Amino acid sequence: MEVTAKLIDFANANATVKIAQGAIKAEVEKLAKKASKTMKMDGFRAGKVPVAAILKRYEKELTRDAEQDLLRNAVDGALKEVKKDAKDLVGEPYFEKFDRKDGAIEAQMVLSFRPEVKLDGYEELVPTYNTPKVTQKEIDAKKEELLKRFATPEAIKEDRALKEGDFAKFDFEGFVDGKAFDGGKAQNYVLEIGSKQFIPGFEEGMIGLKIGEEKDINVTFPKEYGATHLAGKDAVFKVKLHEIQELKLPELNEELLKSLLPEEKEPSVEKLEAKLKEQLKNEKIFKLINDELKNQFAEALVAKFDFVLPKNIVEQETDMQFRSSLRNLSEEELKEFKDEAKYKEKRESFKEDAQKSVKLTFIIDELAKLRNVTVSDQELIQAIYFEAYRYGFNPQEHLDNYKKQGALPAIKMSLIEEKLFADIFKKNDKKKTEKESEK
């Protein structure tokens, strides 16, 4: 095997590899001999399978494994030539050429390494912002939202029609093609009007009903409805309204205050409002960071700092962005890319954005190190569990699915990014200015 390698720049090296047919055959023989000591095969005792029998049945698989082993050895050889360590490698080698001829291999590959990233003066790029002001009206609305969690529906006494936000107690029965269907009937059912728990059109059809009134509501089941025998079909629901209920907010007494402010020895309405004000301010800052500041800062970082990028990572990102764009094209539009020149031209159009994306990833990684921002495995699991609870998934299954997809590193990186920007833009960061103003 011949390996020659040369550094192109700090982050990339070119390597030329030539593996003779004899070297591949010798490696195949070596793997076959090793397998013969443990392999079981009908007609032979375990560990006594002849090498010839193994080669006859598994030569294709052994050749593939042998080539992979030799290419790994070639990478090791290339690293020695350019005086780099395996721990410096990022991503997989990028093959610019890979030819098989007469059982031999000739390849040209690019090995990429972690770039040298220096961010001197990055603090000057952090955008300034005005601290959002929270109004009493917003605090009152937040307080009402909080109290609604402890509210209970109570029947109204006034004579009025059902409106959005009310709770309706009613009987209903559904019919498709004039026939009642399973699961389409209930009595004294309680439903919040406007909650969209029922199929589209049902809750809207109930608005305006008064207690004791009956009505036929015409709806159409969604095409993607879970019960396939009903999906896409027209239906009629016969309903009778028995009671209209409104949420009654609880009194903000000492007992409720204690449950809302368990950390306070002497809880009060004033302390609750102060806590809600702080929450609202943080929510506004978080929104401001995500909607504006983060993008401004990221663009400034990418524009100011320049360093050599790992070619293989850029190529991978280019491929990913290109393939993602193809998913949005029609079959007719996709036909255009059967032309190799147009295919390459379209793929190349994503190169600049890919370079910016890769550069930002390494900048964020370096910033996280500079500011000692980390995400523990426990924090990662908690974030995934929280996501599962939000969407009604089984937490452990949700975590396992991400593991199978190999998505944990990407999720961890996104959490580090979120934590990093929160740290950079936090209130007591002396590297930015704040002015009190109403947002």
Curated annotation (Swiss-Prot):
GO terms for biological process: cell division; protein folding; protein transport. GO terms for molecular function: peptidyl-prolyl cis-trans isomerase activity. It is found in: Cytoplasm. Residues 165-250 form the PPIase FKBP-type domain. Its EC number is 5.2.1.8. Keywords: Cell cycle, Cell division, Chaperone, Cytoplasm, Isomerase, Rotamase. Coiled coil: none annotated. Its main location: cytoplasm. InterPro entries: PPIase_dom_sf, PPIase_FKBP_dom, Trig_fac, Trigger_fac_C, Trigger_fac_C_sf, Trigger_fac_ribosome-bd_bac, Trigger_fac_ribosome-bd_sf, Trigger_fact/SurA_dom_sf. GO terms for cellular component: cytoplasm. It catalyses: [protein]-peptidylproline (omega=180) = [protein]-peptidylproline (omega=0). It is an enzyme of class 5 (isomerase). Transmembrane segments: none annotated. Consists of 3 domains; the N-terminus binds the ribosome, the middle domain has PPIase activity, while the C-terminus has intrinsic chaperone activity on its own. Belongs to the FKBP-type PPIase family. Tig subfamily. Involved in protein export. Acts as a chaperone by maintaining the newly synthesized protein in an open conformation. Functions as a peptidyl-prolyl cis-trans isomerase. This is Trigger factor.
